[in-house]
């Protein structure tokens, strides 16, 4: 049995048999399909991912004890509007634990690497991803912090866990950050040169970090970039 959806050069091709038999398989072939569309189909709206997915997904025993796996490449992959490069990801799902296990690697220009491993569980409505970042763009902060920061052009290296209920996601870890960002209220740009920031529940903490203005003058910043489950960001710096 075959079914297909086409739009210009994009398509979804579905082929196979959906039965209780573990030997019967449904194959879904994707070509340049918008990730936002796919996530909408499974009602995932906790955070925004985008890009164009090409690859194969397979499902077995869909009316018995279903299993599924996929191998996908996502071009122009973004998280909350922030660029992360091209993502290669393997995923598998088993109904017994209800989790989608993820093993992904995003490669961006400038030898930026983001390694992603863990799971998302639609059944339990939770997430646990371990992310190793090497000079990863943090452009997504432009979405979260647009009320008080602008033109955020920073990069992070470190390890961060994305954990918690899907409606209350938290970031936990530590990263070295470098790059520039503008403070809207001061109409001034500042530069970080590899100091550490600490990610704790509902808080991103700066401890004695060095910052530089456009003339190279040094300042020391301590403070907090607070949020509520990755929303309603605010800051308290001195």
Predicted regions and their residues:
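Interface amphipathic segments
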Residues: 1-161, 166-238
């Amino acid at each position: 049995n075959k079914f297909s959806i086409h739009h210009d050069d994009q398509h979804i091709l579905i082929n196979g048999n959906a039965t209780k038999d573990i030997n019967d398989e449904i194959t879904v072939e994707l070509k340049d399909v918008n990730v936002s569309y796919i996530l909408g189909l499974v009602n995932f709206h906790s955070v925004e991912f985008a890009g164009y997915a090409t690859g194969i997904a397979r499902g077995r025993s869909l009316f018995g004890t279903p299993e599924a796996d996929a191998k996908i490449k996502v071009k122009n992959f973004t998280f909350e509007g922030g660029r992360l490069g091209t993502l290669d990801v393997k995923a598998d799902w088993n109904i017994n634990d209800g989790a989608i296990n993820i093993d992904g690697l995003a490669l961006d220009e400038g030898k930026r690497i983001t390694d992603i491993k863990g799971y998302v569980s639609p059944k339990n409505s939770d997430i646990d991803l371990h992310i190793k970042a090497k000079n990863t763009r943090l452009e997504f902060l432009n979405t979260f912090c647009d009320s008080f920061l602008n033109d955020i052009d920073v990069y992070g290296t470190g390890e961060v866990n994305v954990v918690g209920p899907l409606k209350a996601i938290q970031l936990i870890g530590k990263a070295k950050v470098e790059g520039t960002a503008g403070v809207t209220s001061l109409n001034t740009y500042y530069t970080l040169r590899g100091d550490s920031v600490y990610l704790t529940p509902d808080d991103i903490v700066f401890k004695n970090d060095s910052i530089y203005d456009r003339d190279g003058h040094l300042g020391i910043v301590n403070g907090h970039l607070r949020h509520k489950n990755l929303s309603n960001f605010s800051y308290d710096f001195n």
